[in-house]
């Protein structure tokens, strides 16, 4: 990057992820902002090695809060990514523990350390098996070509399904008929049976939940081609009324629009908002 920090470019399905930035935040964790300056910072950094990067279209931005261990003075990127378990017995609160810091790459080790500390205090002295237990769908490899032929799907569609669900992809497909194998979002792609699976087995209760589990609307279409279709399918499983189906689709579209606004800049974002307001007025 322009200030010497590292930037990563990672392939992700039909797109590439570019990141990351670090900044202190005091915002609502349910509504964290992405700034235009952060987008420009990343694009300028990548431009040094990919000169034509500005010709690519930014389809969205993503943000999250990382609970790094606090230390006064260092810049955000210099803060430790280590984790720590605090026993609050010393504060007079026996049985209360805080898990601080850490990151996604070490979450299972962090969980094992917490279990090894707390379980014996509850009378459970069995050894922790987290380190040897496969994640859901990670018990065995899936044969993509065999699944594509068996269920009459494109290899790409099956490959993306396996990427998201591993060996569970076969179960998801086997539970569906031909209608269930319909492609809902062609940019990812996401199948109808995958939307149903998220609602039935993965505790999805909103269309945004479905999107987070399947990548519905997260690609180039931004939900324009698939939000309503996805809402109809999820609604059949979750018992939504027609009005709730429309409301869920609208909320997903609003979410995807918010993720794109930092990429087009503040002034253009305001112009887009004015255009949308004018269109709504004309449509009345």
Predicted regions and their residues:
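Small/polar glycine-rich anion-binding or flexible loop at a beta-alpha turn
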Residues: 212-217, 227-229, 250-251
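C-terminal catalytic lobe of FAD-dependent flavoproteins
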Residues: 1-19, 23-222, 234-235
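Low-complexity, small/polar and acidic-rich linker and loop segments
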Residues: 240-284
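Alpha-helical interaction/regulatory segments in DNA maintenance proteins
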Residues: 222-240
């Amino acid at each position: 990057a322009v200030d010497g920090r590292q930037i990563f470019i990672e392939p992700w399905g039909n797109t590439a992820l570019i990141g990351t930035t670090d900044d202190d935040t005091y915002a609502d964790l349910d509504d964290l902002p992405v700034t235009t300056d952060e987008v420009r910072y990343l694009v300028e950094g990548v431009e040094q090695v990919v000169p034509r990067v500005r010709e690519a279209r930014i389809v969205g931005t993503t943000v999250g809060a990382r609970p790094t261990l606090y230390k006064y003075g260092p810049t955000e990127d210099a803060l430790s990514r280590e984790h720590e378990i605090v026993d609050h017995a010393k504060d007079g609160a026996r049985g209360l523990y805080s898990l601080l810091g850490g990151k996604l790459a070490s979450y299972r080790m962090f969980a094992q350390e917490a279990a090894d500390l707390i379980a014996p205090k509850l009378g459970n002295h069995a050894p922790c098996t987290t380190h040897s237990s496969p994640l859901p769908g990670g018990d065995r490899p899936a044969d993509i070509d065999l699944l594509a032929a068996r269920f009459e799907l494109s290899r790409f569609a099956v490959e993306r399904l396996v990427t998201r669900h591993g060996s569970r992809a076969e179960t998801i497909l086997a539970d569906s008929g031909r209608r269930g194998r319909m492609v809902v979002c062609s940019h990812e792609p996401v199948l109808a049976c995958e939307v149903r699976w998220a609602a039935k087995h993965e505790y999805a209760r909103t269309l945004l939940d479905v999107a987070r589990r399947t990548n519905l609307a997260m690609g180039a279409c931004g939900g324009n081609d698939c939000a309503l279709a996805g809402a109809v399918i999820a609604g059949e499983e979750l018992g939504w009324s027609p009005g709730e189906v429309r409301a869920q689709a609208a909320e997903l579209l609003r979410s995807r629009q918010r993720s794109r606004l930092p990429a087009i800049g503040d002034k253009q974002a305001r112009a887009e908002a004015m255009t949308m307001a004018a269109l709504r007025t004309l449509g009345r």
